[in-house]
Amino acid sequence: MHFQEIRRAAAQGTISLPPPANSEGLEDLAVLKSCLKVIRELSGFRYAFAKDAMAETFAPLMASVEAKNELERQGLKVSLKSYFLSLILKDLENPDILLIDNYINALFNSANEAANGPITVQTVVNVVNSFPQDGINWRENPQTDEEQILLQPDTFPDSKAVQVELARWEKYSKELRDLDPLVHALLTNLYFMAISPLNRHNGRVTQILLQLSLMGQNINSPAPCLMLGRALMTNAHFGIEERLYGLRTRQWSPYLQYMLKTLSKAILLSGELLASLQRLYAQTEAYLKMIGLASHAAFLPVIFKHPACRTGEFSSIFTTRRQVASHILNDLARAGILERVEDGRDRVFYHTRLIELLESENYSFSPLPASIDPFVPLYQKGTPGR
């Protein structure tokens, strides 16, 4: 998004704030056509999402991909396999792994609020407080120790100037007037970027706020899991100078067209990722039935929700004996669905195709085996302890 350049231009007074509050001279035909295109694409994605019984499981997985993409856009290299392992070990010491977890929490902790109202200062506070280890505070506030909840819900910045900027931004966010909802969301996001009210990580927070604003009642994105990070990386060829020139002269169309194109790309990528997850689930279910393990298909939702799993966690989820849980996981490993890895005195079972799909550039996964050597499953439906 070239956040630094936009912030610098705003500081130099070359971006006129606040943005327009009505459509006069703002929404030209090209912008309106792009808005209609994006809304149609988002409607299609929302329908595909709504009719999928696994949507609640897939949404956090998709959000983990978005978090990974966004962090890699910032120059960090993170592994989702390591992240999923850290979740079951309850070991989030690695700062990059912790950042993925915080990013996902920031998206989902504010999702319900975002779906029912405008983005506000309270939303900013909720997002920032999802990253306690980063020491984020209001711009120009005294520095405090890290590992604290730095922004209280009813506390505005110490700086009067930042207070005024935030109050004006929130007022703009709440007043839709006759703007197209997408245009309003994008300009509200640009406005936040331009004032940069935080002492650090304004770019990351801006990105999350955009995800949340797209869930608003007038746009209705189904979950905060659009692939915005990757879309921004692939659309970076659109020159910042062209965008800034338009903003300097209050010609907003170049910037809006760029962001609408980015949203369109993000929705396309999100649809592809969702379709790949659906395809892997359906193929895995069909494969289990083909090899005589139809009863094991009932456990697929768990191994999709927990791509790294141990016997203890699996046993707790199904309220069953560890021996039964071990039988199920080992059957799935022998069938080639899971990969069993020794981890000290315990074993970790990885859903390798799912992790491969989430980490690949084109959301692909290795084909399931055409056949396997027959074996007698350790778990049979009706096993004592179930």
Predicted feature descriptions by range:
Residues 1-386:
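FIC/Doc superfamily catalytic core
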